[in-house]
Amino acid sequence: MTKRRVVVGMSGGVDSSVTAWLLKEQGYDVVGLFMKNWEDDDDGEYCSTRQDWIDVVSVADLIGIDVEAVNFAAEYKDRVFAEFLREYSAGRTPNPDVLCNAEIKFKAFLDHAMSLDAEMIATGHYARVRERDGRFELLKAFDHTKDQSYFLHRLNQAQLSKTMFPLGEIPKTKVREIAAQIGLPNAKKKDSTGICFIGERPFRDFLNRYLPTKPGPMKTPDGKVIGEHIGLAFYTFGQRKGIGLGGSKDGSGEPWFVAAKDIASNTLYVVQGHDHPWLLSRQLVAGNVSWVAGEPPADGFSCGAKTRYRQADAACSFGRADGERFSLAFDDAQWAVTPGQSAVLYDGEICLGGGIIEFAATGQPGQTAPAPAAGHTGALAEAR
């Protein structure tokens, strides 16, 4: 009997290594595939590509599988990094891991795996896939503290139908135990936390290599200039550290937070206090939508939503605007909803999909909002 071939995306980390071992133990014909998606600075202190490949080869030798490397650097720069820079240049804060999953790990990688006669692909992501009534659902991982469905919400039916997530039902602590028990050479390797395939170098230093600094005024809501920023691209909504106001004696004495950007005047607005009205939003508009099932929820659908990773699902109602945009009205105000990030919708354990946040209505006067979806005429309409 011919074994089913599964190509596993192996990064050199513990999760993908245990994924490959589990599938081998289950009787699959496992092939490991290591993706090299970034060319620059491979000899620098922040890029671990060489060591990661060494770890992949060591793990493959231990568990007895074939492994190869494939270079997707051109695809990554064209499909992910170029968009990453465009978004930052426009004053937004993108999430490259979301786009990397949709365009590289589950598109370029999937296509290459199929050329190797694979029936399925597998990764070390913490999520689950369930087939029901001929459709494929993306579910949260059993270990909600490690759930990564937020980053996978742009996957479609074709991609999910070919994807396995063996770690979706296993706690992270158990994965570490398995790695130690079977003697994986990378069993104690720490999890990566940097931007997808760029590493853990200081982010501002990295971004400054590609985007020029453009200093401008830093103002309070009443228009008082209290400092100078180095460029709007280098700040994000809700940011507290690194804005250079730690010793400022102006205002109430509470911490300062980035609250708004005025691209036209190159002005960065900062506010004092975690719960300042300019940091709180009850409604948002998102575009560039993607739905796991191929269709959006019904207008007025009650669901949960995340506007950032590791956030608890926030109760809200969904409003359909048009084919490319939707609005969300939250039961409770959300903190630092950031344009460029993803708004991801959930029906309990099921990830429905989502879109890129374009606008969030806050207490800032004079906001210009896109037209709200039907039935969502409150804060968005008032902000217009």
UniProtKB/Swiss-Prot annotation:
Site Interaction with tRNA: give positions. Answer: 125, 341
Instruction: Tell me where it mainly resides.
Output: cytoplasm
| Localization, UniProt | Cytoplasm
Q: Which cysteines are disulphide-bonded?
A: 100-196
Family named by the database record: Belongs to the MnmA/TRMU family.
**Which function does this protein serve?**
Catalyzes the 2-thiolation of uridine at the wobble position (U34) of tRNA, leading to the formation of s(2)U34.
- Give the protein's recorded name: tRNA-specific 2-thiouridylase MnmA
Q: Upper lineage ranks? A: Bacteria, Pseudomonadati, Pseudomonadota, Betaproteobacteria, Burkholderiales
- What gene makes this protein? mnmA
